[in-house]
Amino acid sequence: MINGSIVALITPMNSDGSVDFASLERLVEFHIDQGTDAIVAVGTTGESATLPMNEHVTVVAQTVKFAAGRIPVIGGNGANATSEAIELTKSLSKVGVAAMLGVTPYYNKPTPKGLVAHYKAVAASTDIPQILYNVPGRTAVDMKPETVAELVGVSNIIGVKEATGDVSRVKRLRELCGNDFMLYSGDDATAREFLLLGGNGVISVANNIVPKAFKAMCDAALAGNAELAASIDEPLRGLYSTLFCEANPIPVKWAAHRMGLIECGHIRLPLTELSEQCHGLLLDAMTRAQIEVK
């Protein structure tokens, strides 16, 4: 099973909006070198909402190719039409992903019954492990632990990414879903506590720019060393909040560009590049997190 420090990878782009595959390859190498445990390709942070399906599949496939078996790649397969999610899932099943991460259908606000039916239909279209993804702040639907529990019996649904920031859900999910069901935090600010309470890993935005420290924090928390985990995590807490001074992934892309990790900080409309009033805030947070900028 995939656990530990997982990066929600940005999708680097050229100034004309095309995907910058040279920078993508460098990012994959960077995370392998820094010890990251797995990569999520083309999730929320990877701008899945603005990549058409053929481009989405290509970016995931290239990420798998660059990884070359050295680090697991999880492909984002979420959509708000079940038929589209199934089509995407079938395409991703052919490119070598270790698992897929499917966000709850957004905007159309399905009922719990609809969520269960959606995920069962998607899971039935592939043998690849599936991870549920709950982020109500973006989707307008909250998949409660009781709904997640209805999907535990589906053999290739292996876990959930819980991005509400409500760490009380760790205990409830564990009670309802059992010890073998994987629980991933999707909220950097509460990730340490999430792991110490019994979570298995973190799918992280900050991990794009502080992978070594984030890996060390995750390892310490998973080992039950709360003191060590806190000593690593506390200096990063200002960074966690500042990376959401505007909608993700606007700030983290800007930061990655300032670090020289990607050639260009371009982001696709309707998102725009980081506002000037946030530049100083983010630079200050990066400095306090001991991140070198160029």
Swiss-Prot record:
Quaternary organization: Homotetramer; dimer of dimers.
Protein name, as recorded: 4-hydroxy-tetrahydrodipicolinate synthase
InterPro entries: Aldolase_TIM, DapA, DapA-like, Schiff_base-form_aldolases_AS, Schiff_base-form_aldolases_CS
Subcellular location, principal: cytoplasm
Marked site: Part of a proton relay during catalysis: 44, 107
Species classification: Bacteria, Pseudomonadati, Pseudomonadota, Gammaproteobacteria, Alteromonadales
Keywords: Amino-acid biosynthesis, Cytoplasm, Diaminopimelate biosynthesis, Lyase, Lysine biosynthesis, Schiff base
UniProt GO molecular function: 4-hydroxy-tetrahydrodipicolinate synthase activity
Ligand binding (pyruvate): 45, 203
Enzyme class, first EC level, given as a word: lyase
Function: Catalyzes the condensation of (S)-aspartate-beta-semialdehyde [(S)-ASA] and pyruvate to 4-hydroxy-tetrahydrodipicolinate (HTPA).
Documented EC number(s): 4.3.3.7
